[in-house]
Amino acid sequence: MGIRIHRLRKQFETFTALDNIDLEVRQGELLALLGPSGSGKTTLLRIMAGLEHADGGQVLFGDEDATRMSVQSRRVGFVFQHYALFKHMDVFENIAFGLRVRRGNARWAEARIRARVEELLALVQLQGLEQRYPTQLSGGQRQRVALARALAIEPRVLLLDEPFGALDAQVRRDLRRWLRELHERTGLTTVFVTHDQEEALELADRVAILNRGRIEQLDTPAMIYDKPASPFVYSFVGAVNRIPGVLAQGQIQVAGHALPLANAALAAGPVEVYVRPEDLVPDQAGWPATVAWSQRSGSRLRLRATLEPSGNEVEVELPASAGSFQPGQQVRLAARQYGIFPA
């Protein structure tokens, strides 16, 4: 089931958390909400779940208006950053909790609850640990229990709030791969919040970049990285060089060289050229530059160079096989791809 957000607004006193957000999450999609602190990503997720209420706008699950629905009526699986497991319950009881608190006709028979929990233990690869308590589990195992508990109620959508934020780097990497495989098996519409760029770009089918309560760009990870829609996206996702230039008579003049202008709608005047370090390459037709320093890092070579005659410093990232560069060495650098925005 897909989710549609229409002109969603949320205000906390004088702070605008969400400013007329429009968003469509496709059925079966894994969507990341990525942005800095205060961008509105967690507020948006909590409104989807029914844990917060919007000041205006709509939340639709499929064709059903869920804007004023209770949390229970939405049938949403929600995973908190810090797991929110019950310490006095073992793994089995934690997973079964959402099924056991149901009342009336919604309550399952005990045999069905047990079968569902055993199915989920196999799905999240925790067979044999069902009698352990949360304090006896690793961080990664606790997160799997939290996911199994969210899935137990057979939710229509799955929402995750920074699911790997409390884990160390290696466990996060392992769990990312595992969650992607789990999503492929379940096909459940899933939205997760993160401030980790690598996590969003590796896991998601599409990424929504939020900033100051608005969506700056919604696109595939490849397009987010290669074709950022705004200076903010360029600067927030990955490293970038910003080089001042001027647009005049249909040409961009940057550091004494002309660059092709792809955006015909750009007005004449001062501009900034955004170039990622890996998109600057040695090329005899490029800008003259002087190497300030170089450093080998595994399979990559990082340089800092000063463009001439402008004096602008740029970071360059090359394959280690590109050779060695010494401070003071003269090079020429060309931009393979770049973005141009008004200064």
UniProtKB/Swiss-Prot annotation:
Catalytic function, reaction form: sulfate(out) + ATP + H2O = sulfate(in) + ADP + phosphate + H(+); thiosulfate(out) + ATP + H2O = thiosulfate(in) + ADP + phosphate + H(+)
Binding residues for ATP: 35-42
Q: What keywords were assigned to this record? A: ATP-binding, Cell inner membrane, Cell membrane, Membrane, Nucleotide-binding, Sulfate transport, Translocase, Transport
Q: Where in the cell is it found?
A: Cell inner membrane
Q: Name one GO molecular function term.
A: ATP binding
SMART domains hit by this protein: AAA (SM00382)
> A Gene Ontology CC term for this entry?
ATP-binding cassette (ABC) transporter complex
Query: ABC transporter domain: which residues?
Result: 3-237
Query: Does this UniProt record's set of keywords contain Cell inner membrane?
Result: yes
Q: EC?
A: 7.3.2.3
Question: What is the topology of this protein in the membrane according to its UniProt annotation?
Answer: Peripheral membrane protein
InterPro entries listed in its UniProt record:
AAA+_ATPase, ABC_SmlMolc_Importer, ABC_transporter-like_ATP-bd, ABC_transporter-like_CS, CysA_C, Mo/tungstate-bd_C_term_dom, P-loop_NTPase, Sulph_transpt1
Short name of one Pfam family for this protein? Answer: TOBE_3
What role does it play?
Answer: Part of the ABC transporter complex CysAWTP involved in sulfate/thiosulfate import. Responsible for energy coupling to the transport system.
Query: NCBIfam families, from UniProt?
Result: 3a0106s01 (TIGR00968)
Q: How does it assemble?
A: The complex is composed of two ATP-binding proteins (CysA), two transmembrane proteins (CysT and CysW) and a solute-binding protein (CysP).
Q: Which family does it belong to?
A: Belongs to the ABC transporter superfamily. Sulfate/tungstate importer (TC 3.A.1.6) family.
Q: What is this protein called?
A: Sulfate/thiosulfate import ATP-binding protein CysA
